[in-house]
Amino acid sequence: MRFVRYSLDGSAGRGVVVDDLVHECSGGNGGPGRVVGRLAELALLSPCDPRTIVCAGSNYAGQIAEKGRPWPERPPLFLKSHNAVTGPDSVILRPSEVRRLEYEGELAVVIGRTARDVPADRAADFVLGYTCANDVTAHDWRDDGQWTRAKSADTFCPMGPWIETDIADPSALRITTRLGGRVVQEESTSDMVFGIGELLAFVTRWITLEPGDVLLTGSPAGVGPMVPGDIVEVEISGIGTLRNTVADRG
């Protein structure tokens, strides 16, 4: 099943995609209700509205090798703020003070039920589904030690286009990032250092995650700069493609 959020007549709604139509979510199970419109004609929002966004760094073998970093003993974690969230086809805004803005294509895990002290082997029971994300980073702010600012500026967490619930094996997905149509990142989620179960178990020992919260699972090798006018796409097999443009914030 694919869940979306959309904007219609000035209001946000939640829907289920059936073929090329979006139906209202109805009832306690969130199943399809009346038809809202065609998927291609609706303005999609981020498919979830998380209270908490927990992110894993240095979690792909390719990126660790590329950067010459030591293999982490525990998942390196950081947070992105709620205001960073934006949706598919929206604009990523580069602050005027930022000289180098970077893309980081990632698999996002969307939480489906309250998760606290989750055993790694039961992680799937707490997951609603998966979506594409771009962990946008202001490289120069990160390097001066201001990680919160570097990761959490407005529009620095695009997600979408929808939440895909029917993923049999999230450890066997292909992440591809394109910049202006050129492939700049490509790696399998099987190359994660810490799998989704390990990450969720580690995070929820201290942080309770609620339905709609998000766990970003790290970015493959090939992280690089993007500039105003660029179109950046994050495609994940079995899910879809998240597409955004870059512009100056002014």
Question: Which ranges hold each PLM region?
Answer:
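Short catalytic-site patches enriched in acidic/histidine residues
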Residues: 76-94, 116, 155-160, 216, ...
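Short Gly/Pro-enriched turn/cap motifs at secondary-structure boundaries
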Residues: 97-101, 151-154
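N-terminal accessory regions of nucleic-acid-interacting proteins
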Residues: 116-130
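Extended, compositionally biased flexible segments
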Residues: 2-96, 103
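Residue-level recognition of short, solvent-exposed, well-ordered loop/turn junctions
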Residues: 55, 102-104, 210, 227-228
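Short, structured patches in soluble enzyme cores that scaffold and shape functional sites
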Residues: 80, 105-107, 111-113, 131-136, ...
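Catalytic-pocket segment enriched in acidic/His residues
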Residues: 26, 35, 43-47, 63, ...
